[in-house]
């Protein structure tokens, strides 16, 4: 859709959880990077599934089973269209981004990485996009290499080209950093990887909720994301993989539905995408994810981008009026809707606890990015993040709470 704005007040009404008060204050939920809230439209389709056609898929010919199968496979088609994948078989439903990346590391990685090969990542990665590759490198006696970052936590083309070479077999990179808000040029990185015969696996957990994705344009070999960060249910994720790669990969989980034929001593596997979806799949969650995608598409990514950009820049400017507050990452005009910060000498957990008393929900800790924390020279940070239901009032509430927090911790008892 081409709309450049939406009625945020109307959007807020779609999220029942935002109606409540926290500590007798209006709730300012600024933790969507960890988990977004869920609109009533998604809640309704989940309720409808369990009330009207709760059944297993693929196996039954009865009416409820057919309805459930249609809902599940229609959800797959919705995801395919959403990211412009070429084939429906390229969409694998998983438990989330972490599970998706692990499938790639274990199935593709174990079969294609040998001693002396190189796997390229960055220090800005979530643990879900470091640990699987770290373990793969250990299993195969391969080398894990890191693309250097600038002081603002961005990647430069020369450094990317200098790190990826003919020994590189896999490049694993976040489209958007969950800490810094850095937006990586994954299309260019994919092109460089392919020039050296490597594949690229993109962690899209922080991009899928916020920007239009086109797998034909990006040319990623694998792309992973989660439903719960994009207005959908928890427990559902997506692994996109190019069909020719997935066809040659072995399944990593075994059981019902993913088989073609089972004898006493051997088995053969079902075709894509089923061979990667062992057991009863995430039926309700997939249907809920599809509805979340419809909701996002109705708002339009242009409008979502403009809304988040305005909020992020406003928050960036207002937060920097507080003495002793340091923001990490790129400048305000080159970041996604994430602001990670520290306030004077106050521990981030104390900051998060203090602002919570004022109804403000932010995240504190290492954000599953300990190598990045070490790179920043800190043990932890606080983080505010913005989505479609946030307003300048939320930002003002955060800034006021931070000022009160600083004043409280500066008081000499």
From Swiss-Prot:
One of its GO terms (biological process) is cysteine metabolic process. Keywords: Pyridoxal phosphate, Transferase. The keyword Transferase applies. One of its GO terms (molecular function) is pyridoxal phosphate binding. It comes from the Bacteria. Catalyzes the removal of elemental sulfur and selenium atoms from L-cysteine, L-cystine, L-selenocysteine, and L-selenocystine to produce L-alanine. This is Probable cysteine desulfurase. The active site is at 368 (cysteine persulfide intermediate). Its EC number is 2.8.1.7. Its cofactor is pyridoxal 5'-phosphate. It catalyses: (sulfur carrier)-H + L-cysteine = (sulfur carrier)-SH + L-alanine. InterPro entries: Aminotrans_V_dom, Cys_dSase_SufS, Cysteine_dSase, PyrdxlP-dep_Trfase, PyrdxlP-dep_Trfase_major, PyrdxlP-dep_Trfase_small. Gene3D superfamilies: Aspartate Aminotransferase, domain 1, Type I PLP-dependent aspartate aminotransferase-like (Major domain). Belongs to the class-V pyridoxal-phosphate-dependent aminotransferase family. Csd subfamily. The modification N6-(pyridoxal phosphate)lysine is found at residue 229.
